[in-house]
């Protein structure tokens, strides 16, 4: 009977959560990420992607592409984690076993769809997406096929906010023209080897004989990739153990002999590990740097922060504190950076100043001012960081609470004044109020309150307030 594996991927998840909880941002180009000189984009709304902005891009580059209309929002992973738990609670209730890949995507193989027609699969997926949208307000895309590979490619084709079902008799029409790098497991090394053989597309790989594949790529990995290229994918859908550590390391053909070479290698590994950390959705407390010298000695040094963070500048600066150089340890062959002590609880969300413990605050970036301009109104929203922001307890996009106006977020702070937009998921676009920076009625707030899911938090033993 026909097997159906489905892959669900939340659309622009981090940015969608921001637009959900801050109605002012809906329909506007949102960039989620750090605003320091080395900040990177953790998520970009589809409005921002139209300008070429994307995840893992340096923030300054993304802001330049989007222009003045870009809204830069500090990540709130505590919000994204809660939204993810609620989404996958719905998915698991409908599908049973779910194989979570990250905070915003996963595989499922519903028993109810064994032997189903493509039309029935599409209907099932649409009903799932509709329930997720109704309950959480978040958009999602679903791909379906005979295995994980086809399902994941299908969800990409379904974006944004759609369903893409690939019948068995149509899967080669989808697979064959795609670049071979689209296959699971084809990295730079394997890709280069295939390119040297004249294999550029998945169809090219599928057309090889088994003997050619075994000789070129090996009997294990090679045959596995060959089967995927031919649409054969019997990997089971099963729960994954949660990662305890996220790392990336690189071995260099030539020994690293200078401080500059090692610094570049640390940045390369830190950036790669950080991309995976953002996808995971948690913050890290411990940073480790691993070195393997030319004589095969291995040295690993670690530092544990007092809180978990995903702020790249903080993590990178910590890695540099741990670095050792050829003048100290001799020629270096391998450099790796890892993040561990992974936590969903994020103190730096409530207290943004924590991320200044490791790094010296950079000079104000005069290009940081970003705005939101409504297409239907002359009213604008300025999210800004003037020169005296370092002296203020208030940071742009920080969650706050006022006893009269409720939950809101900081749009700008400076010159003794803080401007706050009061709104949550369940409100319409909120009004902006200005207060003295030392107003005793204005206090930091739990970002979870912006979701306004008090009943759900109570039912699931979680908290959505400051207590």
UniProtKB/Swiss-Prot annotation:
The record marks 14 as: Substrate discrimination. GO terms for cellular component: cytosol. GO terms for molecular function: damaged DNA binding; DNA-directed DNA polymerase activity; magnesium ion binding. It is found in: Cytoplasm. Its EC number is 2.7.7.7. Gene3D superfamilies: 3.30.70.270, 3.40.1170.60, 5' to 3' exonuclease, C-terminal subdomain, DNA polymerase, Y-family, little finger domain. Belongs to the DNA polymerase type-Y family. This is DNA polymerase IV. It comes from Corynebacterium glutamicum (strain ATCC 13032 / DSM 20300 / JCM 1318 / BCRC 11384 / CCUG 27702 / LMG 3730 / NBRC 12168 / NCIMB 10025 / NRRL B-2784 / 534). The gene is dinB.
